[in-house]
């Protein structure tokens, strides 16, 4: 009993104070430029309006630090008995498969301690898996193992409403014939990360969540983390929703215990996931070599790229390195994008499954926060676009053919169709090549509910031969 009292005094009280401080900061962070905040707010609100998703909780990292947290919409929809409850930053959402990067980090921590190597065969730690003496830990963390996915469906099957242990998942899916030869294909598979989580437990001798808490969550101050694999979120958190086809939103069913182990079990606030992003940017949990392994695109045996590292998607965003991942479990969809070299991250957590609102908001917000300046070609295209929305064009920019094209009728059509759209969320160049002695460029113009494609041809003297807009395919 004395030991318990000492623990309560020395651990729980400071932890409680940390919780209170963290929740307060999550609620009050607004250190972002007002104009930038307005753009992010507009993106989030318009995407929610267009998609019908009830709510989004957003956290923004700039210059390596959290500068903005905000929540939009309703965390709980109104019923006959209760009013709608607005979303607030303190509410937790399930982050789904974003959890995988925490599992990958646990493995890399164990490698740093000399307790395993990511090039070890999985059978060294978990005997009995199909071709476990050949498939490596690196291959399970990069989805190149060949182990069949136990949950490819985008809904909760009846069987998943009942408890299932990690060992039962491995016995059922980890002992099937591989879908392909290890290292020869990329195929997303939740089974891989159940295997990885079991390896963490086997090597450490402690529960997976305990290891993450001691080595990641507690050091980073991520005090809101919740194990959704063992218990559903509380009434103070966001309610998960889904719908059948175009029907009404309904409270989503909860997966049974065990199904999300190590592959999608974490829930937290957007603020706390942004704390994790701060650590990725600062490289504060792992050694530099481990982050290099995590962020490096894994290649197949034939040299083909996979756009995947270890537990993370690895993308090029207009010449900027993006480390990202989405997540979906019953009633929740999330997106976490980190422009790692720019010190920028966008966390978006939403409470409706099967809808891409989270990814749309994150992918629109991140480059805005990074402040990528428009190229001269983009700037010119944007200025012409704004003029066309007002029914005018600067003919000094146009070659004779294009000047002839923009008749009063054409200008009227451009104005009547583009003006109601207002300012686009983003406007950027996607392609450039030389053709017919001119420079061809393609641009993507993004609105919450639609995308447009602009194509131009420019002569060496700078005169425009084409400026055409059509719906993007």
Q: Which residue ranges define each predicted feature?
A:
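Short active-site loop at a secondary-structure junction
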Residues: 49-57, 79-140, 178-191, 261-264, ...
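Short solvent-exposed beta->alpha transition segments
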Residues: 392-437
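Short, surface-exposed loop or secondary-structure junction motifs
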Residues: 70, 74-76, 133-330, 335, ...
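Short, conserved catalytic-motif segment at the N-terminal edge
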Residues: 29-93, 115-120, 175, 320
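Short, well-ordered beta-strand elements
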Residues: 324-325, 335-352, 454-455, 464-470
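Short, gly/Ser/Thr-rich active-site loops of penicillin-recognizing serine hydrolases
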Residues: 348-410, 472
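Bacterial N-terminal signal peptides
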Residues: 11-22
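Exposed beta-sheet edge and beta->alpha loop/turn motif
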Residues: 432-473
């Amino acid at each position: 009993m004395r030991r318990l009292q000492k623990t309560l005094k020395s651990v729980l009280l400071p932890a409680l104070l940390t919780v209170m401080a963290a929740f307060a900061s999550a609620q009050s962070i607004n250190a972002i430029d007002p104009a930038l905040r307005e753009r992010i707010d507009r993106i989030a609100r318009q995407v929610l309006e267009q998609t019908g998703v009830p709510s989004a909780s957003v956290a923004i990292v700039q210059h390596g630090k959290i500068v903005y947290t905000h929540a939009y919409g309703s965390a709980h929809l109104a019923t006959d008995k209760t009013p709608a409850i607005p979303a607030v930053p303190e509410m937790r959402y399930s982050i789904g498969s974003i959890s995988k990067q925490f599992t990958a980090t646990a493995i890399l921590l164990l490698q740093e301690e000399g307790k395993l190597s990511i090039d070890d065969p999985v059978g060294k730690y978990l005997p009995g898996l199909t071709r476990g003496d050949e498939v490596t830990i690196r291959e399970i963390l990069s989805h190149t193992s060949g182990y069949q996915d136990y949950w490819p469906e985008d809904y909760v099957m009846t069987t998943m409403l009942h408890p299932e242990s990690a060992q039962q998942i491995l016995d059922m899916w980890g002992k099937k014939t591989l879908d392909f030869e290890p290292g020869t294909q990329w195929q997303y598979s939740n089974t891989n990360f159940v295997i990885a989580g079991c390896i963490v437990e086997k090597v450490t001798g402690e529960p997976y969540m305990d290891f993450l808490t001691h080595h990641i969550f507690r050091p980073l101050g991520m005090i809101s983390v919740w194990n959704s694999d063992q218990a559903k979120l509380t009434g103070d958190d966001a309610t998960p929703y889904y719908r059948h086809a175009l029907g009404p939103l309904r409270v989503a069913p909860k997966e049974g215990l065990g199904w999300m182990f190590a592959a999608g079990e974490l829930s937290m606030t957007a603020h706390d996931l942004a704390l994790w992003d701060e650590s990725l940017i600062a490289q504060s949990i792992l050694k530099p070599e481990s982050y290099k392994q995590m962020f490096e695109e894994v290649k197949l045996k034939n040299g083909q790229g996979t756009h995947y590292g270890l537990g993370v998607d690895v993308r090029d965003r207009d010449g900027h390195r993006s480390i990202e991942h989405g997540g979906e479990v019953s009633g929740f969809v999330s997106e976490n994008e980190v422009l790692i070299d720019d010190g920028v991250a966008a966390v978006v957590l939403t409470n409706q499954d099967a809808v891409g609102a989270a990814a749309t908001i994150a992918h629109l917000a991140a480059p805005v926060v990074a402040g990528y300046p428009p190229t001269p070609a983009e700037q010119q295209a944007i200025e012409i676009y704004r003029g066309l929305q007002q029914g005018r064009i600067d003919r000094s920019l146009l070659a004779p053919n294009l000047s002839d094209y923009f008749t009063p009728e054409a200008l009227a059509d451009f104005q009547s169709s583009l003006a109601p759209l207002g300012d686009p969320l983003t406007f950027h160049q996607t392609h450039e090549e030389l053709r017919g002695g001119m420079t061809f460029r393609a641009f993507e113009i993004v609105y919450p509910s639609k995308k447009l494609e602009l194509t131009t041809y420019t002569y060496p003297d700078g005169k425009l031969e084409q400026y055409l807009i059509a719906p993007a395919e």
